[in-house]
Amino acid sequence: MAAQTSAASTLAFGHPKTLAAAGPKTPPAAASVSFPATQPACLLSASAARRRDVAAMVSAPPAVGTAMPSLDFETSVFKKEKVSLAGHEEYIVRGGRNLFPLLPEAFKGVKQIGVIGWGSQGPAQAQNLRDSLAEAKSDIVVKIGLRKGSKSFEEARAAGFTEESGTLGDIWETVSGSDLVLLLISDAAQADNYEKIFSHMKPNSILGLSHGFLLGHLQSLGLDFPKNISVIAVCPKGMGPSVRRLYVQGKEVNGAGINSSFAVHQDVDGRATDVALAWSVALGSPFTFATTLEQEYKSDIFGERGILLGAVHGIVEALFRRYTEQGMDEESAYKNTVEGITGIISKTISKKGMLEVYNSLSEEGKKEFNKAYSASFYPCMDILYECYEDVASGSEIRSVVLAGRRFYEKEGLPAFPMGNIDQTRMWKVGEKVRSTRPEGDLGPLHPFTAGVYIALMMAQIEILRKKGHSYSEIINESVIESVDSLNPFMHARGVAFMVDNCSTTARLGSRKWAPRFDYILTQQAFVTVDKDAPINQDLISNFMSDPVHGAIEVCAELRPTVDISVPANADFVRPELRQSS
């Protein structure tokens, strides 16, 4: 990753991957696997090799203070604050409406911010930026750029952006006329259109991304960004509707929103860090932490296929089927899976952490939790490990690009858009449960459900930790985004309402990986429990003493000042997911 420094702005990254200035690159060699002398390599499956590596990965509890990337940064406008997470020093910038008067200074040189796209993030970010800049009495124009003929023009007009006011227009005119271009179209569309986008950008303008996907795509082609523009990222740790909803809810409490990471990939004139931080503050981020563009896309694409979307979908499907097969009635099974995870379990983790979920159980409940946790941890990590390496190798990125092209007819084959994911019996039962749910009901705390879910959460934390991600990124991608931003949407109206309010990349990944978690839990974890296999006490001990719990306590103090409210008839979600009652 190319991190440029200047006198006004420096970024010290721990172990970035530097891209050559030009020319194709040799793909990295595949990771080698050594096999025991007694076992021919051809007889050791990839899954078995992963399981062996996984076992080595968690054979001892994580040490406090083990090496993690250094992500210090310099800002001339905002106050940088040092926090300690599990013995690691990191730096953040706290947000708040009281900082809005600083936005004109931080955005110095920016006369127009072009927001390109109107999907999940586009509407939220455009409206938040517009409202924050207006409160700061700034004359910076926020303009929406859409392709001609797009149905989103009407949605943008309804949100107050118009051609007459110069705040809505053609995508290419908007790119050419903007000093800061926020590229919020789908990842697949970015991959297919980046050359034209780059060619329309002004020299010394700033490209803003809310996901590092494009970097991963360029890396896979041996390419990089143009050298005459700055490249930054601000990545809210939640779907677009959450970004807007919490911003609106928090107007009276000094600004609430979604935590964001930021990265400076290229800085051509020393302004990039302050512009990125201003963008994040204007979105309403309670706190902003540093990452690299490469670390962001790896953790984000991986995370949404894991506990954020795909894995939690797979878990509740597997548990619902297990509970009903064991004789539990369907409504109780739904309550003890979806309602419990998105309700009492998420609420407890959000406010008090994972250990509080465990400590609130009875002695018998703790035994059941331990069985579920012990049996589920390694199977979940097996799939998570595979998923992370698919993302890091570029395989998952290529999958997203190709899937986007299959949305349209080509080569004589029909179009294959994404299908529904909430039409099975389980989700119809969920509709009935929600129709009679008392207001504020958080569902039951089922110890087996809690054990499986928290095993998944801890397995994801461990993968990201061993892959060198910072604790702020780990906790946001594995815990905070899940319980504070995404699960409330499934609680409100089921799995599709959660998944399909997210980006196309997230929606595709969730559909692809959810069945993998369902399968491995059913075929490995639950079978282990039913055989009454001994509990792995080392896993339980490691969970109880893991330093991540202390880091989560620190991050809990930086959470949004209000809890998100997601009514079933929410009007701040994707138009196709709205309902009248």
Go through the PLM ranges and name each one.
Residues 3-4, 112-114, 141-143, 179-183, ...:
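Structural motif
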Residues 153, 174, 190, 272, ...:
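Small-residue helix-packing motif on alpha-helices
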Residues 1-53:
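N-terminal chloroplast transit peptides
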Residues 208-305, 406-442:
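Rossmann-fold dinucleotide-binding core
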Residues 64-164:
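NAD(P)+-binding Rossmann beta1-loop-alpha1 motif at the extreme N-terminus of oxidoreductases
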Residues 61-97, 256-259, 317, 325-581:
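NAD(P)-dependent Rossmann-like dehydrogenase/reductase catalytic/cofactor-binding core
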Residues 65-72, 139, 147-151, 157-216, ...:
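Rossmann-like NAD(P)-binding element
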